[in-house]
Amino acid sequence: MAISNVISVLLLLLVLINLSNQNIKGIDAFHQIYEELQSESVESVNHLHRPSFHFQPPKHWINDPNGPVYYKGLYHLFYQYNTKGAVWGNIIWAHSVSKDLVNWEALEPALSPSKWFDIGGTWSGSITIVPGKGPIILYTGVNQNETQLQNYAIPEDPSDPYLRKWIKPDDNPIAIPDYTMNGSAFRDPTTAWFSKDGHWRTVVGSKRKRRGIAYIYRSRDFKHWVKAKHPVHSKQSTGMWECPDFFPVSLTDFRNGLDLDYVGPNTKHVLKVSLDITRYEYYTLGKYDLKKDRYIPDGNTPDGWEGLRFDYGNFYASKTFFDYKKNRRILWGWANESDTVEDDILKGWAGLQVIPRTVLLDSSKKQLVFWPVEEIESLRGNYVRMNNHDIKMGQRIEVKGITPAQADVEVTFYVGSLEKAEIFDPSFTWKPLELCNIKGSNVRGGVGPFGLITLATPDLEEYTPVFFRVFNDTKTHKPKVLMCSDARPSSLKQDTGLLAKDRMYKPSFAGFVDVDMADGRISLRSLIDHSVVESFGALGKTVITSRVYPVKAVKENAHLYVFNNGTQTVTIESLNAWNMDRPLQMNDGAL
């Protein structure tokens, strides 16, 4: 017992030393603060691993997407941005606009710390279009005492489609934490919605000890806000709820999105939260009671760590908005870097936004489905296809005729019989990641693993596989389909640093895919862009984003394969692949 206690104390000291070395402090603990690095100027930008068709500023650090909105013919995206360096710090609201969600023009920054209610930071928030007033920003400001406050900003000229200049009125803040709340964990107001009782409502994330909390605030005039008596929802042991999102989905229309203020009987609500502790997100489907201002999850999936996710990979701080132009709900999300802090500084940039995705309720009514917006297909170039090609155990077939490091690949697999599927161990029911770590792409199975090998060298010294493995769930008598995106073999680079910031993060990511495979088919789409691989299983039922940094499998030296390591022969029923061109404009302008 004494030895055990000594070991525990030593481990605690190591953790504290590690935190101290990383300069993580106070309320900023949810971001790693490198005071000596956050203003280190960028002399040049290294393009070796830089994506070509994903949203990025020309240089420096980017994180949360903020305030996406469609207004007067333009898509607007604001985002957290470091004006001076490639690590987190000096954060402002940068601002870009687009006509097509593909080509982006950078404008002047919208918000930066300047007044007592945000002098310590202008953090994440949303935009609401208020009838008679135009767009209004709700955002989190940090005062000099490091207390988080909710503020608003208005456009100087609401008639300007570009919304170039914003004003922070002196009657801010509009919401402050009361004595029952944690003032250092009170942030990220959602887009507000107008209810039939005459009130506007917004949701703000928080925590009390280890309980994650979403508070609702109400207002009649969008200036004076009052906290509801009870949280709209909370959950023990989930920690701080960052970047909450709350929106309705239709139970009958599986093609169109709904605006926030839609009222109708055939709807469910979605509550998504970003978990500060894990840097993962999860969501539930449920019922929102307007009179009580309470949200009640259905209970069909876990409400907590093991819940459903928008994306099972490197994806965080996501934010949706309703696109009035095409009657759809669109999702943005941040994919951070996975290499070292030193590498980020040397290359002069860090972070990107994933390709925007449409959000719909699946026809099963049990989960959401996500798909890249159709506009991204305008970047498709050279095209190759493959049909009705069998892949036997141990085979891999190269996809030639495109640029594998910058591509869009869609493939439908036919597996036929599932008799050879391995028996599913029920202890992994809520542990897809652990199962993927054990059953990697090189571990032979019955039905699978099969899928794509992306960003690979010919000898597979480096590669990032995205694949399925089908199990037989004897409890449900249905197939259990595992989807993995495994970055462990993605790079030959060896990091020996003692601290996390000095080591490349090369994880596997995984999620189960809810398909019955009655017709023996399953689809996979991967968007490959140098250091990011976004993959969509079964038409978007399961999505995984990986960040990878090959040493050899870069640019024209990267290869793409289809593979099968299962004893069951798998057929490539159809494969369509395209080069992806660069957008004509990617944030050229004010930044």
Curated annotation (Swiss-Prot):
Q: What class of enzyme is it?
A: hydrolase
UniProt-annotated binding residues for substrate: W61, I62, N63, D64, Q80, W88, W123, S124, R187, D188, E242, D276
Question: SUPFAM superfamilies of this UniProt entry?
Answer: Arabinanase/levansucrase/invertase, Concanavalin A-like lectins/glucanases
Q: Which reaction does this chain catalyze?
A: Hydrolysis of terminal non-reducing beta-D-fructofuranoside residues in beta-D-fructofuranosides
The UniProt keyword set, sorted, is: Apoplast, Cell wall, Disulfide bond, Glycoprotein, Glycosidase, Hydrolase, Secreted, Signal
Subcellular location(s) of the protein: Secreted, Extracellular space, Apoplast; Secreted, Cell wall
Q: Which residues form the active site?
A: D64
* Gene Ontology terms describing biological process: nectar secretion; plant ovule development; starch metabolic process; sucrose catabolic process
Q: Which residues form the signal peptide?
A: 1-22
Name-wise, this protein is Beta-fructofuranosidase, insoluble isoenzyme CWINV4
Gene name in the database record: CWINV4
